[in-house]
């Protein structure tokens, strides 16, 4: 590592979780990038899972898939969308992965009879992850998951403390995000939680250089001075992380409160002002729209909308591109039946996202049937495409008991089946993952959307269309317009309906490649069709 040129920014959080550390880290990256610096962002997650791939979306939220096939925390999606820098498997690590690698090294004899301990062996592995391949970067922004004080976070905090000591203040800065709650009854902001959070962080040897406080309103000068005195942080480095209506307001908001300026001052770096015109343009468009598009999303994880974070953002990007306001009607697939189709009366389009398991399948099928019969724009993603095939096989091709072996292993017509190479005893890491090529049929709607014959999209699935049913379904009007290669045994990646204005299913996850500045063409077309 070129210690003279690479600076490390560590972002920690206190008081409560879900304050927006990932968005703060992404905003810092975007602001430094707007000044011309080369950056990367990394995430340390303290849970014992090797990755979030087998975790419930209701507990953890979305699993974000990188180009190289890593199943990662949803914050990596924020990193990519805010900066355009593609993340990799080297940008997210968990306690589980650290221990997994540690025990493999121990079994190989790499430690030569040493007593393997948290310090130095675990912390050394964490340090290696943070420092790996950073010598050509100006800044590495590293977010530490969880909350200061959690027992799971201790090895990670010790690791960044060590890096801060070894590289000195000239090359490291600690940014701590806390909560300053507003008590309605007292009509005042309370700083005590922030004081205790900084005290907790200081107890492990880390003195924050900047405090970001999450709040509805800014603190007064007197309140900032109080925190500065009690937390040993300059009052100019106590910066608000205010609630915003649109997350893409955050970089400009942080810049207006001098966050990037104070970071550069810490490192004694002179820099031109950031070019934030693209961020201003996005906000100007989103604030000026008057027309609304209504999209119905039918899913089973809607109790935690973070389960669909990239999907929501991709629809927002496409709506901004089409200069309309997005309104999402969330429908729980487990409570939807064929007698409630009036729920779709005021929607412009229907979307079925990815998912797992048979819970709520009938509700999704009801929505697909409605979209097909009423010529409403429909987009099915991953399982959404598979269910569209099952619905078509049953109701149009009249195949008896057409289903997926994921839902019924012994169905008569398994139009969706598990890929043979993925039939393993382990669930974790046992899917087709990451960016793969997809060959599009010339003259198809999907080709007209992408305007190219070969695309690359990210996948996350272990079930696929059974090619034995291809000819039969084609005879009834289902069109297969995208495949994984040009061979006869290629996986089906895209389907369309012959007699429908806009009905597309994709096996891949296009939402992972959308950004506010490069809205995904498939979502642009979907929103446009919703307006027609």
Curated annotation (Swiss-Prot):
The active site is at residues 382, 509, 511. The keyword Nucleotide-binding applies. CTP binds at residues 17, 150-152, 190-195, 226. UTP binds at residues 17, 190-195, 226. L-glutamine binds at residues 355, 383-386, 406, 462. SUPFAM superfamilies: Class I glutamine amidotransferase-like, P-loop containing nucleoside triphosphate hydrolases. It is an enzyme of class 6 (ligase). Keywords: ATP-binding, Glutamine amidotransferase, Ligase, Magnesium, Metal-binding, Nucleotide-binding, Pyrimidine biosynthesis. Belongs to the CTP synthase family. This is CTP synthase. It comes from Ehrlichia chaffeensis (strain ATCC CRL-10679 / Arkansas).
């Amino acid at each position: 590592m070129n210690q003279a040129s690479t600076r490390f920014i560590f972002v920690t959080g206190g008081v409560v979780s879900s304050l927006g550390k990932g968005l703060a880290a992404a905003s810092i990256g975007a602001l430094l990038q707007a000044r011309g610096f080369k950056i990367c962002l990394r995430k340390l997650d303290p849970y014992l899972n090797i990755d979030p791939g087998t975790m419930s979306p209701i507990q953890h939220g979305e699993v974000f898939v990188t180009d190289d096939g890593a199943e990662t925390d949803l914050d990596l999606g924020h990193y990519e969308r805010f900066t355009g820098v593609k993340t990799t498997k080297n940008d997210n690590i968990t306690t589980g992965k650290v221990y997994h690698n540690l025990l493999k090294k121990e079994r190989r004899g790499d430690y030569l009879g040493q007593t393997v301990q948290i310090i130095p062996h675990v912390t050394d592995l964490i340090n290696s992850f943070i420092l790996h391949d950073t010598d050509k970067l100006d800044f590495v922004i590293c977010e530490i998951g969880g909350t200061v004080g959690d027992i799971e976070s201790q090895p990670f905090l010790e690791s960044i403390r060590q890096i801060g000591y070894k590289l000195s203040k000239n090359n490291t800065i600690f940014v701590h995000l806390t909560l300053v709650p507003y008590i309605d009854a007292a009509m005042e902001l309370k700083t005590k939680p922030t004081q205790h959070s900084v005290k907790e962080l200081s107890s492990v040897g880390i003195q924050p250089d900047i405090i970001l406080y999450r709040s509805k309103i800014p603190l007064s000068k007197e309140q900032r001075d109080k925190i500065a005195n009690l937390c040993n942080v300059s009052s100019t480095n106590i910066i608000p992380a205010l609630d915003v209506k649109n997350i893409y307001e955050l970089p400009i908001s942080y810049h207006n409160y001098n966050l990037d300026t104070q970071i550069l001052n810490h490192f004694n770096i002179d820099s031109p002002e950031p070019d934030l015109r693209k961020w201003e343009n996005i906000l100007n468009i989103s604030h000026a729209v008057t027309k609304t598009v209504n999209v119905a999303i039918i899913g089973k994880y809607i109790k935690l909308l973070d389960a669909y974070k990239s999907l929501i953002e991709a629809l927002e990007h496409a709506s901004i591109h089409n200069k309309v306001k997005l309104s999402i009607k969330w429908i729980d697939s487990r409570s939807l039946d064929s007698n409630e189709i009036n729920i779709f009366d005021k929607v412009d389009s229907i979307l079925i996202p990815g998912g797992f398991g048979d819970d709520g399948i009938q509700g999704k099928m009801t929505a697909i049937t409605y979209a097909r019969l009423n010529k409403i724009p429909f987009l099915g993603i991953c399982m959404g495409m598979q269910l569209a095939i099952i619905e078509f096989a049953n109701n149009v091709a009249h195949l008896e008991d057409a289903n997926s072996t994921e839902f019924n292993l012994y169905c008569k017509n398994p139009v969706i089946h598990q890929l043979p190479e993925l039939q393993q005893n382990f669930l974790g890491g046992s899917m087709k993952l990451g960016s793969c090529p997809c060959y599009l049929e010339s003259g198809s709607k999907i080709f007209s959307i992408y305007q190219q014959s070969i695309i690359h999209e990210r996948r996350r699935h272990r079930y696929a269309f059974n090619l034995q049913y291809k000819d039969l379904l084609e005879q009834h009007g289902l069109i297969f317009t995208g495949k994984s290669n040009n061979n006869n045994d290629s996986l089906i990646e895209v389907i369309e309906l012959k007699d429908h204005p806009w009905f597309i299913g994709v096996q891949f996850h296009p939402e992972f490649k959308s950004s506010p500045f490069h809205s995904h063409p498939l979502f642009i077309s979907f929103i446009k069709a919703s307006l027609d």
